């Protein structure tokens, strides 16, 4: 049974999916120092769009391996969700932004600032499309008074030198450390260009995060043989009810339909990529009582023959 009380959400449901090594893991040689702890994935926020909701936070997820946190997207409230998930904010080492929509980057700066307030003393590398470097500088400029005051008054290490922003303009290898390696692919999310999906390969398993995208051949190539594909998903019959409640966005339906993926097509992508498990996330509509979990699953299973999981906040996979 899923516990909905916030204090009880630490008892996350766990879905253990395949741990085989995958095609694509030979992109780079494995570091000799890589350890053997299992790579974990926790969905921090699974609702699509920037409007705050009661039960589903904005898009974010964290990959954990050997006490290191790799955060993918930073929607509103990501720091609090990390705390709910039992992740030490001081373990943050890498941030990957798929694209620059506010439901994916609104708390990019905040998660670093709050991690620093919670004891972060080590380097954090951020990866994503331009203008990530300018955004990073502007966030620190905005919060310069608070940062300087805390350094002087509380004896904290300087924050700005800890954060290193790296801008991506094309797909390919992103980074590799002693735990895993990361590869990006361009995905189709107009008018936001570039937008990326990311693949994380460790010794025991592989995880792909689609970001926001219409069905993408490049994403299918990126996800070949992956253990887990987390893909954004629409349930088309619920879109009209969603947009009816947002009267100041007159072309919202057209926007949603043109550069996201239906649950059925997410299944098609997963099948074409040969992934082991499909996770539907960035759900649109989120929290519509007329759209049941089984409806999402049935739509994805039109084309995908493997396990389908409907994402929920704080679900560990």
Annotate the PLM regions:
Residues 2-12, 16-24, 34-214, 294-316:
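Binuclear metal-dependent hydrolase catalytic cores
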Residues 29-31:
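N-terminal signal peptide c-region/cleavage motif recognized by signal peptidases
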Residues 196-197, 206, 214-315:
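Cap/insert and terminal regions of metallo-dependent hydrolase folds
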